[in-house]
């Protein structure tokens, strides 16, 4: 009760002093400090009594309340001093130096309290500072301002010391010891030398293979110009005969690879003969039958024909009945020993392997076999090169016409003639046989028509042959197979022939003159052209897109 009365009286005095006004700066400071001391004494006494009764748990709560009240009152006193100071500055511009020193001392009292309020970690030290302040305020309650200055200085020094220690404690929360350098955040404290980047050693690349000079066609032909000798002989050797029994072997000095055609079997050019028994060939055929045509596990040579073991036995039995080299040549092609050319593969596949050999063995017309064999050899660009003379072309054409219709030999001759007709200088010989070829075109099979149309296609590219190709007979023979029932390959060949003829006619308009064409010929040509135009319109709706596209382009060109 006494404490509360004292506090009330102090507050009353402060209010009265503020209302009445302060006559001088010294009186205002003394009254303000006296009021602050009185309030602080009353509050701090209350705090000390509460600490004695409550204990550690209550100390923290009373500290918090006491600090807030003291700070609030101190701030009010500071405001009063500031207003008083401004009034004094207006009234008088000069004031003693002794009076100036009082204001910072009052501020110094507030500084420890404010710092103590911010630091919550050092409660023990704060209690000591507060007890010292209470004692100093109690002793100097009735004393003059000069007597309280040393205590205030001691209090300020204590507050500054405690604040420095508290700052050190706060710093210890974040780091300890000496302050590390920035570089230690990224690497150890020990200074390490900068590492120079060294590129990885390059892997030694294999030296690039030297470019081999490509041989010309002439040099390649000379390189392969070696003689070839293939025959089936018994293992025991002796005379070159074909006994009915015995283990036969293939003997060959070299396998010649024709220019431009890759052989089905690659046999290196050994110095000695190459031996392969029929039993080994039969074993390879059985492996191929077991593993498939191109297996990875099969070690047999690649073949162009699928020959079953039964067919192989039958083929061997047929070979024992004849000594014809042409039949043995075909047998080596079927076995995959000798290279089979594309057109011979087609012929053998179409006719049948054993059927062909059987027909050749039983065929009484033995004279055409060597001729067909010579055609096969000549078409493969041997060491002497293709025979391109006039007499040779006559011989080939006569051989084609003398063979039976649609026979394999005739097909081989037609394909050979297609290769020979590439050169324009030999066309005048071939054009003399056009009427005979038209007969093959009208009566032949699909393959016979195909090879005849190939020959006509080569002839249509030459301007000198246009006169013969646009005759009534040729046009009617070309238009006849031009329908939807014909094979796609033949239709495309006929379109190509008419495209070439159309180009020659448009570039050379002098073809239609009285000296070269009669009136009847021109009428027949126009009639055939009209019929051809109607068939073109029908083929424009062909099911095959390639044929349909070619027909539409030809219509636009015409």
From Swiss-Prot:
Record flagged with keyword Transmembrane helix: no
ARM repeat segments: 300-339, 422-461, 463-503, 520-558
Domain of life, source organism: Eukaryota
Keywords: Repeat
InterPro entries named among the record's database cross-references: ARM-like, ARM-rpt_dom, ARM-type_fold
Chain segments annotated as transmembrane: none
Biased composition (Basic and acidic residues): 1-14, 139-156
Coiled-coil features, chain-numbered ranges: none
Region (Disordered): 1-34, 139-163
Family statement: Belongs to the eutherian X-chromosome-specific Armcx family.
UniProt protein name: Armadillo repeat-containing X-linked protein 5
Organism: Pongo abelii (Sumatran orangutan)
Lineage of producing organism: Eukaryota, Metazoa, Chordata, Craniata, Vertebrata
Gene: ARMCX5
